[in-house]
A protein has these predicted regions:
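Hydrophobic alpha-helical scaffolding
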Residues: 147-151, 185-186, 213, 217, ...
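A short beta-strand-to-loop transition that corresponds to the Sensor-1 phosphate-sensing loop
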Residues: 81-82, 216, 263-267, 287, ...
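Conserved helicase motor
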Residues: 217, 239-249, 265-270
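Structural beta-sheet core signal
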Residues: 38, 76-78, 212, 283, ...
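Conserved motor-coupling elements within RecA-like helicase/translocase cores
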Residues: 243-261, 274-278
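Signature of the SF2 helicase/ATPase Hel1-core->accessory helical subdomain module
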Residues: 51, 97, 270, 276-337
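ATP-dependent helicase/translocase motor core
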Residues: 1-209, 218-234, 256-260, 296-299
């Protein structure tokens, strides 16, 4: 999945750097001579020194005295050997997170074990270059310095869904790309964004069209604002909220590839007319358990006679029959997709 690695990696400790003042960062990871990761360590046994002090050292003193070091910085690590966290140079302290898992490990770890998962997980060479390439989001228009580094659940989820979509794509696959269950606050919208980038940048998919469906308009506004502000990151200038079903049909039929379209599930009801039968369409549905469970037919009796209605999923699958479907949910449920 990662391709050939011709990069040169060096880990340098205690390098004196002279800027406005002389500073000596504890560790720097150089890739091809570029200082991409800076480490700051504190002692676990000295009670007065915490990793918050390491954070301040990086973001106050180093920023003031050796700002040149951070021109190429991807992210930073603060650690006392027991508490080990990664974060963007511009992020507040509470947005530094532990990397608690490596591929193949059954459970998440904490404490001293999280140093192992950080080095084996985040700093596995293939994963490190994947993170630098695909999992650091810089918004298109940002008034302040803003850079968002993925957290480990977002990384592993986006990668797993990407591989699953590959297998599920029609005609060879069954179109079921899988469901991601993420607890509230896990940064689900970023997982969607990272997944979208992987799909759009992938040589395998050759610029697919992505339809992002939510079932709440308030969330849709938040999500669409985030996506519309990520055109550079996604790699496609067409990232649009769709006003109506007819609007979506026009947009889908006017292209053979590319484009990210955000819509709400309610725009799909009452009509099962084909939107497109292309198989290079990936449908990402938020709160999947609510919107897609009911393929069932319902019958309503009215003065005009019997009227058949269907659950949202029926409309969806009839409208995009060859798409691959991926669901995101905060509530585990058996019948998603």
């Amino acid at each position: 999945a990662y391709g050939k690695d011709n990069n040169i990696y060096k880990f340098v400790t205690q390098l004196e750097i002279v800027g406005n003042e002389k500073r000596i960062p504890d560790g720097i990871v150089y890739i091809n001579g570029l200082p991409l990761v800076v480490f700051e360590f504190k002692s676990a046994i000295r009670e007065e020194a915490t990793i918050f002090d390491a954070f301040k050292q990086l973001t106050v003193r180093y920023r003031r005295d050796i700002p040149e070091l951070f021109k190429y910085n991807a992210f930073c690590i603060i650690s006392d050997g027991i508490n080990n966290k990664a974060g963007s140079f511009f992020a507040p302290y509470e947005f530094f997170y532990a990397w608690r898992r490596v591929a193949g490990l059954a459970k998440e770890v904490d404490g001293i074990d999280s140093m192992f998962t950080l080095t084996q997980g985040m700093f596995h060479k293939n994963r490190l270059r994947d993170i630098i390439r695909n999992f650091i989001y810089i918004p298109d228009s940002s008034k302040k310095n803003e850079k968002i580094v993925c957290r480990y659940p977002q990384y592993y989820a986006a990668r797993a869904l990407y591989e699953n979509i590959k297998k599920a794509q029609k005609p060879e696959g069954d179109g079921k790309g899988g469901t991601y269950f993420g607890a509230t606050g896990c940064g689900k919208s970023f997982t969607m964004l990272y997944l979208t980038r992987l799909l759009m940048k992938s040589e395998y998919f050759k610029s697919p069209t992505i339809v992002l469906i939510t079932d709440r308009t308030d969330l849709d506004d938040q999500l669409s604002a985030q996506f519309v502000n990520a055109k550079t990151f996604i790699g496609d200038n067409t990232v649009e909220s769709v006003e109506s079903r007819a609007d979506l049909r026009d947009k889908l039929q006017g292209r053979q590839s590319g484009g990210v379209f955000l819509t709400t599930i309610h725009k799909f009801t009452e009509d099962t007319e084909l939107l497109t039968d292309r198989s290079n369409v990936i449908c990402i549905s938020d709160e999947a358990h609510r919107s897609q469970v009911n393929l069932d037919q319902k019958i309503k009796l009215s003065e005009k006679g019997v009227k058949k209605t269907f659950g949202f999923a029926k409309y969806l699958h009839d409208s995009l029959p060859n798409a691959t479907y991926v669901g995101f949910t905060g509530t585990p449920i058996d019948a998603t997709l």
